[in-house]
Amino acid sequence: MYLSKNFFLNLKTFIFSFFVLCFFSQSAQAYPIFAKQYFSSPREVSGRIACSYCHLAQKPVELSVPQSVFPNTVFEAVIKVPYDKTVKQVSGQGSKFGLNIGAILILPEGFTLAPVDRLSESLKKKTAGLSFLPYNNNNKSTFMVGPVSGDKYDKLVFPVLSPDYGPNTAFLKSAVYVGGNRGRGQIYPNGEKSNNNLFASSSNGVVSEIKSTKNGGFEVVITTNDGNSVVENIGSGATIIVQEGQQVKAEQPLTTDPNVGGFGQSETEIGLQNPIRVQGLLLFSLFILLAQIFLVLKKKQFEKVQLFEMNF
């Protein structure tokens, strides 16, 4: 049964990856689904999440979870990836289209995705159309979603199930980490530079030729001061801001910066609450309340006795 479960989980991951590769091609290769192929751990000891190696621009991300939950309880982890809906990004082929968003959620040990039969009707609607995948077998409490259309989803809701009560259950506060990205990255997970970049000159010299390539990009030929020629390969969809005969310096931009997206990460805490502690607290509070009531009644009785004695 366990082998069968793993087989279908791996099959689901393969089908989803194949779908993304076919329909999003290189434009999607900086999302968590691809980062997991190159990074065994989603988060370094320093706190840096793997997605930040591909998305070089920093953008905000918001995470909302309950302060505390009971064991074996389903709750929502809501991730907001805000961005300007009017902007368009450059695809791997150079065309312009709307931004996609994706997220990675790193939960404390023991927390996992809630099964479908535990979801409320409201939660089913919020998660409709979203496919959640585990990062890998060594990180069973880390899950990913995306890329999905940012126009369709203004937030990403993860249905989370807290660990069941047991002898080894730790009723403590634990950290929850999240990473969220919008748009394409500047570096592919394999280290290659994407066309969603500002391209700059690698040396001093004069732009001697600018020519188009078959894939929609450009080749900028720079004649250096010592007479050699350097060819700068510019990705498709770039806007050239230099012209032939222009003097350029090393690190001088040759194109505009097309990137409109970015990556952000955040963290918060969630506590696993012991029901027995809560029951004990309620009983203690009830005892204090009753004690206060009896003290007030006793005081009233004492005042009546004093008043009666004064009348005699």
From Swiss-Prot:
It comes from Bigelowiella natans (Pedinomonas minutissima). One of its GO terms (biological process) is photosynthesis. The keyword Heme applies. GO terms for molecular function: electron transfer activity; heme binding; iron ion binding. The gene is petA. It is a single-pass membrane protein. The 4 large subunits of the cytochrome b6-f complex are cytochrome b6, subunit IV (17 kDa polypeptide, petD), cytochrome f and the Rieske protein, while the 4 small subunits are PetG, PetL, PetM and PetN. The complex functions as a dimer. Its cofactor is heme. It is found in: Plastid, Chloroplast thylakoid membrane. Binds 1 heme group covalently. GO terms for cellular component: chloroplast thylakoid membrane. The keyword Signal applies. Its main location: plastid. Belongs to the cytochrome f family. The chain crosses the membrane at residues 278-298. This is Cytochrome f. Keywords: Chloroplast, Electron transport, Heme, Iron, Membrane, Metal-binding, Photosynthesis, Plastid, Signal, Thylakoid, Transmembrane, Transmembrane helix, Transport. HAMAP family: Cytb6_f_cytF (MF_00610). Component of the cytochrome b6-f complex, which mediates electron transfer between photosystem II (PSII) and photosystem I (PSI), cyclic electron flow around PSI, and state transitions.
